[in-house]
UniProtKB/Swiss-Prot annotation:
<keyword id="KW-0732">Signal</keyword>
<keyword id="KW-0573">Peptidoglycan synthesis</keyword>
<keyword id="KW-0472">Membrane</keyword>
<keyword id="KW-0564">Palmitate</keyword>
<comment type="similarity">
    <text>Belongs to the LpoA family.</text>
</comment>
<feature type="region of interest" description="Disordered">
    <location>
        <begin position="324"/>
        <end position="373"/>
    </location>
</feature>
<keyword id="KW-0449">Lipoprotein</keyword>
<keyword id="KW-0998">Cell outer membrane</keyword>
<dbReference type="GO" id="GO:0030234">
    <property type="term" value="F:enzyme regulator activity"/>
</dbReference>
<dbReference type="Pfam" id="PF04348">
    <property type="entry name" value="LppC"/>
</dbReference>
<feature type="signal peptide">
    <location>
        <begin position="1"/>
        <end position="26"/>
    </location>
</feature>
<comment type="function">
    <text>Regulator of peptidoglycan synthesis that is essential for the function of penicillin-binding protein 1A (PBP1a).</text>
</comment>
<comment type="subunit">
    <text>Interacts with PBP1a.</text>
</comment>
<dbReference type="GO" id="GO:0009252">
    <property type="term" value="P:peptidoglycan biosynthetic process"/>
</dbReference>
<feature type="compositionally biased region" description="Low complexity">
    <location>
        <begin position="332"/>
        <end position="363"/>
    </location>
</feature>
<feature type="region of interest" description="Disordered">
    <location>
        <begin position="297"/>
        <end position="316"/>
    </location>
</feature>
<dbReference type="GO" id="GO:0008360">
    <property type="term" value="P:regulation of cell shape"/>
</dbReference>
Amino acid sequence: MLSSITVRTKSGRLIPLVLAATLLAACSGRVSTTPPAPVQSEATASADYYLQQMQQSSDDSKADWQLLAIRALLREGKLPQAADLLGQLPSQLSEAQQLEQRLVSAELEIARHAPQQAQAILTKLDVAQLSQAQQLRYYQAVIAAAQGKTTLAQIRAYIALQPLLTQEKQRKANIDATWAALSTLTPADLNGMVINANEDILRGWLDLLRLYQDNRQDPALLKAAIKDWQTRYPNNPAATLLPSALDNILHLQSASTASIALLLPLNGQAKVFSDAIEAGFNAAKNGAFSQNSAPTAAAATDNGAPASSGTLAAATTPSAPADVNAAGAVSPSAQGTDAAAPAAPNDSAALPPLDAAGDPIAPSVSPGNPDAHIQVYDTSSQPLPALLSQAQQAGASLVVGPLLKNNVDQLNTLSTPLNILALNQPEQVQNHPNICYFALSPEDEARDAARHIWAQGKRTPLLLIPRSPLGDRVAKAFATEWQSLGGGSVLQQTFGSSAELRSTINGGTGIRLTGQPVSIAPAQPASVTIAGLTIPAPVQPPVASGGGVDAVYIIATPAEITLIKPMIDLANGTHNGIGLYASSRSYQAGAGPDFRLEMEGVQFSDIPLLAGSDPAILQQAPAQYRNDYSLMRLYAMGADAWTLANHFAQLRQIPGFQVQGATGTLSANDNCVIQRKLPWLQYQKGSIVPVQ
């Protein structure tokens, strides 16, 4: 109860002391209108507001407003001003201000793309002394400082961040981001991780990743494993809020292949391609490719082909069809003249493909279904929208095709409920939930070569390419993939006709490994997000390759590489440590021992069917395709189109899902562009052996 003590005025009136105190407080409140600075809370106002408050504040709170202004400047992308203001902070700061100074310093270093400096600052911060809002920023800074490289510190930051998020949408996004980071780890990475005994949440995440990697090739087993995991780890946030990628798997429904519309050009120059694709597709549908056995060693004949190939080794290949890529058709990577029949490497068994752990990938055999209804539609006779409408009305559940690039480009503007496996790829791929793209092209092979050469530790490649549109396309594809892997600029050197190459030989100069950088459009820079603030990254010029060339990727026919390889040796020596790589365009299976000895050390790629993965299936192919490299590749593409159609839902919804096909180990990227990992072979002492 308030005291009844009063003050008597001259007029005799009584004024309560409480009222007097209230009036005094009101008067004193007019002295300063600056509110206290919430330095440990969120900074949601503009930098101008905080700077104004800083100017009007007393010495006690001025540093608080200064720190808030720095955060606002970072949010607004004004890095120089933020750095200047950070440098103007007084040397005498309170403990709370010192913590905020270190945290905002780390955020500034991240915005400057100096992650190592940011990490050094963050490791000195005591998280327990931070407010909840500061802890949220701290863990987001740890994640951003990882620069997309998955580390234990980054994963722990995601886990610690989860309970600090208040909105369902934020929690879901963080779980998806946690899973995306974990998904980049290989089984070898997992086996090398050491965690603390009390890290139950982290252990649950790692176990979830293991069961995903072990079972993703079988959706039914994966579904059962996920449900069992949810029972074993009920306290893990992902147990009740699964990552979107895994939740999609639980609700996965396989695409029906009971009725398929096959869209191909049945007239004109591309008809020969279509015939080979359709033949391979029907062969797989009827079970020819589901009867294959494990790869076996093949005894070598005198000319390097396996004895199991019978008379194929002696058969000559007719001239391949013209490259009509300019007209929009698929462009198989094959030599155009003097090619021999396919053959397996000799002196060694053809190796099965391996996963990231080094274990063999089981073939993803799609059993034949002779009763499946296949309706072929001619894209050269009617517009694509009309054909898709007809296919839908006829009850098609899935479309395979179109083949020509101009038709594939139209898919971006069409709306159809049908699932589509396009047999080519547009220049600019757009992500459509019902479309996947499967292309067999020199560009696709060049991207695989970039990944292979990078994996072998090479960092300064040179491309030796023909002076033609083909060479330009291959160079762009290789360089784009190379830079996406983290490499610098790629050099290119072009050559002309065989006559030009012979004149170079006559000059005795050889081929020196120099060139000009491949020009490609720069990728959009990634932005940096810290505490919900997105800071655009500046455009960075490509990193120049340092040092001498350590790898050469050659796009040449057998006749051309016969001239090129000796000229490289002439100018650079044969024991120079430079890796030589060639595309399937140069593979001459029927070449004699002289050619194989001349190519000593050269690595080259080709599709598994032509690299000897299953000679029995090769024997079953129609003769007109067995004896022509380019058509045989398209025949294999048709067979893989059947397999991919049967795994359409898995490719769209299970990241990392792989299919072992006749054209390579097939997987899909985020836009469902089918990527091929090819087997690599090497000429060694007159034999052809798998690259270990």
